[in-house]
Amino acid sequence: PGVLVQPDFYRYTATIDVNTRNPRGNPRRGGQYALRYQRYDDTGRDLFSFDRVDIDLQQYVPLVRDRRVLALRARAIMTDPDSGAEVPFYFQPTLGGPDDLRGFRHFRFRDRNTLLFQAEYRWEIFTAVDGALFYDIGKVAPRRQDFHLSEFERDFGIGFRFGTANGVFLRIEGAFGSAAGAHFILRFGNVF
């Protein structure tokens, strides 16, 4: 769907975002809790109309006077097509790449629904350099009922973050766990 026929959409969005992260650019405590609902209405033949719900929950637990942080994230994206309609492949959520399942190539997994959990242990090495150990687990599925913990993809790794309290400007990571081998990540900005 969406390859041979390019539909036009009306898109409606409602968002709730509560942000208590402190500091916001490189959080050491607090959290961010976001819920977004989107409605895509196919303006033509109504073959690709669907609803989408994104839930992104992040929590930062300070340890040892904010020099060490446990960063946790849970994210779910669920799409629900209208009866007889489909979600175009380019609107289907994906997993894989430097911001979610880091041990897998970009867009490695794609389907109508995704579920992702991430945990990072971050510690200050020097004033502008942090170390990070991370573990990611996630899955895509055609139906929400198909999420079984034993079938989730997993990865882990280590990295370094360069930045200030205002934000991370560079992130270097090594991610492991996929059959494709190790992945080296050089990225501007924080993962979450």
Model-derived features: positions:
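Short active-site-adjacent structural elements
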Residues: 141-144, 180-183
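Hydrophobic alpha-helical segments
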Residues: 126-128, 132, 140, 162-168, ...
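A short alpha/beta connector and helix-capping loop motif
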Residues: 146-159, 171
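Short leucine-rich amphipathic alpha-helices used at interfaces
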Residues: 99, 117-118, 146, 168, ...
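C-terminal outer-membrane beta-barrel translocator/porin domains of Gram-negative envelope proteins
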Residues: 1-126, 133-137, 141-142
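Outer-membrane beta-barrel "beta-signal"
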Residues: 13-14, 158-165, 181-192
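A short, acidic, flexible beta-alpha connecting loop/helix-capping segment that sits on the rim
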Residues: 174-180
